[in-house]
């Protein structure tokens, strides 16, 4: 299945149903008073995280989602039916952005998590709501309010503990094949990896971590060179980055300059990502003598001003790979993810009263004090039905 990590969709919540103007008319009850019911609330639009999905490709074709409109009120104090909600399922790890405001509405990081992205309109009030001692035959009602309408950008970001970055052909795909069951394509030409991939590294029956492999970066990626930096977002949730350096590039390039290019592109993309823990890993040491590899790795680290520990491995022959994985596992155990407070999800509104409708009634009450209401029981009233529309 094609990997799609971005999609734009339009979500439109349902409008609220209009209130009804009606009067009770039954045999022997000629003046029964108002009995117009309220409209129904409009349906909401929700997003729900689903661990069984791993791409946003469905939303490249289906881009518009509309909830149902609330039904209008009816006579006999009948309230209109509430509009049906719409639930859109997205992969776990999806970030939701309102393109109109640039606001990040939420991150879908857990299976079953729900996020309200468009609220349905409030229902309108029937004329029963406007009756009073001075207005016994109210001919006012309110219309339902429009539902929310948003253009959303969905960004899928992989959930991994460890992220790998480096130049093309640094050996990232070979590494993930060596430590997990993932089988990304491996070849002797640049940009073999075109989409991100995940692998689960199992150290024993109880300990494991997830590693993410993204396409290689080249100089100018921040300006769109190569595959650009669009895949760097998949590393934002990683706890540690493994910076793989080809210790002896086949194209004769300078490993020090290659490493500086990667660091520079990280800083251009995000200071937060550049500040994440980053480990230096020299790959392909099997292509030279052990002593020569150690001396070259030391000189590269010194040229980069690297003061921490670094690793020498060969992903192809798995030399030094196991020790690196155990150190990563230890780091993950010692640095658990901070348990951020979960944002409270908006509860489903069961309407009883709200500021909008209270304002409508207050306005009518104020008018009643300033004007002498006509008691419209006279049969010769030819003014017809009076409507007051409020938005």
UniProtKB/Swiss-Prot annotation:
Residues 1-159 form the Obg domain. GO terms for cellular component: cytoplasm. One of its GO terms (molecular function) is GTPase activity. Residues 127-147 are annotated as: Disordered. Coiled coil: none annotated. SUPFAM superfamilies: Obg GTP-binding protein N-terminal domain (SSF82051), P-loop containing nucleoside triphosphate hydrolases (SSF52540). Its EC number is 3.6.5.-. Belongs to the TRAFAC class OBG-HflX-like GTPase superfamily. OBG GTPase family. This is GTPase Obg. It comes from Salmonella arizonae (strain ATCC BAA-731 / CDC346-86 / RSK2980).
